[in-house]
Amino acid sequence: MGKQMKGDKMKCKCKMAVAFLLILVMLVPLSFSCGGGGGGGKVTVTVGFLTDFTGPGGPAIAKLYPVIQDLVQYYNDEELIPDAKVRLISYDTAMDTAKYIPGYDWLKERGAKLIITSLPGGVETVKPFAGRDGIPIFSYLYDEAMMEPPGAEWVFSITTPSKLEGKTLLNWVSKSHWDYTQGVPKLGFYDWETSDGIDRQAAIEEYCQAHPDEFDLVGSFLVPSGTMSPTGEAQELKDCDYIFAINTQGAYFMKTYRDSGYHAQFLGACSTFGFYEFFKSMLGWEKLDGYTTTMLLPWWDEENAAAVFIKEFIDRYHPGKSPEDMGASYYGAFYDTLAVFEILQQAVTDVGAANLDGQALRDAGVKYSLDQAGLPEYGFTDTVRYLVHGVAVYEWSAESEGLARLSDWIPFIE
């Protein structure tokens, strides 16, 4: 963990009084605000969240947002940021791209020192302004366009590139899963035509071209976002051995495919875990059985130090609740979000709360690393702007109605 979060803090040797979750304490048009004010002579440090509460991403954000709120309260309760209180303000774009820049401006005008975002395309839209203003942007998403100038030097992705995940999973399947006495497996790919889908498709096609003895890519489809009944694509891929299908679009495809009586094994990505509840309700465990995905965290049933800490944290702020109660988005985003607060903590330690600015946050960000038992390598450098540097492979199991680990942590295949 970071400076204050390992040792005594990680082992929760601090006083473990049960705390009530700070809910939205101020409501204004298109915005939400919570967190401490500047009590006791402390400097108020404002964190902005540019997101989608009421649009298509709203259900997922409803599960993710509490982890940000809880970490704000945790850092304030434990006074982990010297001489400072953290305040969280949020702007709801409803995933309307016309509101991305006004939302950024709204957060900036109210003093946000850094901005967290969950918006597809949001970073590409606001990063030129963030570069101009010196405000670091921390994104739950990653795509190549985020890392292109202008403004890319102020961008941190608190996840991992889909292209590296895809290549690493294919490499694992070829070495550890497929029986080549059956010949070269037929591979298919299906996704919506988003920046992430384009990146992932390019990575899969590149890997297959470089390794024709490992996979025969027989079909690769990008369809318009929102497609829910991909019957034509399902038929085209009916004879595949493996098919990449992820997130909401993957669930629609998998249901169409299974309902048509086809039998390929599905491959997924860590982001799929954020839609865990949706997959269960859409498909049920019988149709999900065998779905093989990468993960950035240990499954919550494991007695793993990283998983145990999240469960203890949940019990502190939501007594009696389990990770499953809180939702996959909460659990899956915990260490990603924690990284933002550890970077904030280090920046304030370096320059003082009264002197905190975007440059201090950026400087702390590029030096950040996390050494936590039970996790892959986490960290940034001046040139590497994605947080997580490895995955484990898991299989969704109808028998256990959970996820079964198939591998240790695997470094990425470039």
Predicted segments — roles?
Residues 318-330, 341-402:
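Segments of small-molecule ligand-sensing domains
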